[in-house]
Every structure is written in C-alpha cells, then in structure tokens.
C-alpha cells in the first residue's frame, strides 16, 4: 500500500508542476496582448520610384506570341509558358503564363528581350505576403495594372513642397551635356 501512496503523491506533484508551467505560459501570452506590434511600415511614406524602376512585371495576354524568349533569357528559367500548336492557323496558341515572384530576381531580361513588348515593369514593389504561394502570379494576376503610387497623397505633398520647387528651379538653370 505504501508504494501506491507514493505513486499518487508523485502523480499529484507532476500534475501541479504541469499546471504551473501552463499557467506561466498563459501569463506570458496574455502579457503580450497589450503590446504594440513589433513591425512598422518604414519608411512612413511611399518612395517615389524612378522612371526605370524594376518592380512587378505586367503582362498583356493578347500581345504574347508564345515564343518563349522570356524563358530563354531568364537566368533562372522562371516564366512558365504553356501553349499548343494550332494547325489550322499554323501558330502557337498561348494557354497559360505565370511568374513566381518569390523566386524572381527582377533582372528585367524578360522585359528587355520580349519581341512583342507584352511584358513591362511596373512601379509596384510591395509584394510581401504571409504565404509564399500567393506570389505565384498567373496571366490574370499579371495583367492587372497596379494602383498608381502617384495617386498617393503623401507623394503629392512631397512633390508640391517648397523644397522640391526650389530643386526644380535649380535643375532648369543647370544644364549638362546630355540636355543639348
């Protein structure tokens, strides 16, 4: 009977210890609920992108001739081009086009070498998601034009600030060799 009593006592001690550990974890979890988020948007204003900025790729399905030049010039063979050969018109018919921006290095080779100019770089650079599979864009997602950064109020106030007007006057007064 004595070994059975010690078994009950050790079981009770283990149960109390487990409840205490669960309680400590719960207290730590509840103490973090009132904290501010760790990540914040930085910079606070959206950046003004340059004219030749290489952001998300825009794709025009109607212009594509499924030549696969974009796949050949891509250093990582990234664009996936599905097509079938139409015998009656003797041309390739594009079925599907997709790019995984989780893998893309934004080199711009596909845009530069496209013979029909169906690819172009946009000024959209905020592509972060919680799931990496959401970065795989098909032809429908690629054909959507991004929301223009120029419509943003913070960008407009920066461009209309007195400092930017002074900089514009300086740029008009100073000429370089390329301006002539």
Swiss-Prot record:
Subcellular location: Plastid, Chloroplast thylakoid membrane
The UniProt record lists the keyword Iron: yes
Pfam short name (any one): Fer4_10
The protein's Enzyme Commission number: 7.1.1.-
Cofactor(s) needed for function: [4Fe-4S] cluster
Catalytic activity line of the entry: a plastoquinone + NADH + (n+1) H(+)(in) = a plastoquinol + NAD(+) + n H(+)(out); a plastoquinone + NADPH + (n+1) H(+)(in) = a plastoquinol + NADP(+) + n H(+)(out)
Keywords noted in UniProt: 4Fe-4S, Chloroplast, Iron, Iron-sulfur, Membrane, Metal-binding, NAD, NADP, Plastid, Plastoquinone, Quinone, Repeat, Thylakoid, Translocase
Binding site residues for [4Fe-4S] cluster 1: 64, 67, 70, 114
InterPro entries: 4Fe4S_Fe-S-bd, 4Fe4S_Fe_S_CS, NADH_quinone_OxRdtase_chainI, NDHI
This protein's GO CC annotations: chloroplast thylakoid membrane
Spans traversing the lipid bilayer: none
Record text on cofactor binding: Binds 2 [4Fe-4S] clusters per subunit.
Binding site for [4Fe-4S] cluster 2: 74, 104, 107, 110
GO molecular function: 4 iron, 4 sulfur cluster binding; iron ion binding; NADH dehydrogenase (ubiquinone) activity; quinone binding
Membrane topology of this protein: Peripheral membrane protein
GO biological process, one term: photosynthesis, light reaction
Boundaries of every 4Fe-4S ferredoxin-type domain copy: 55-84, 95-124
Subunit-level organization: NDH is composed of at least 16 different subunits, 5 of which are encoded in the nucleus.
HAMAP family documented for this protein: NDH1_NuoI
Function summary: NDH shuttles electrons from NAD(P)H:plastoquinone, via FMN and iron-sulfur (Fe-S) centers, to quinones in the photosynthetic chain and possibly in a chloroplast respiratory chain. The immediate electron acceptor for the enzyme in this species is believed to be plastoquinone. Couples the redox reaction to proton translocation, and thus conserves the redox energy in a proton gradient.
Family to which the UniProt record says this protein belongs: Belongs to the complex I 23 kDa subunit family.
UniProt protein name: NAD(P)H-quinone oxidoreductase subunit I, chloroplastic
Organism expressing this protein natively: Sorghum bicolor (Sorghum)
Gene from which this protein is expressed: ndhI
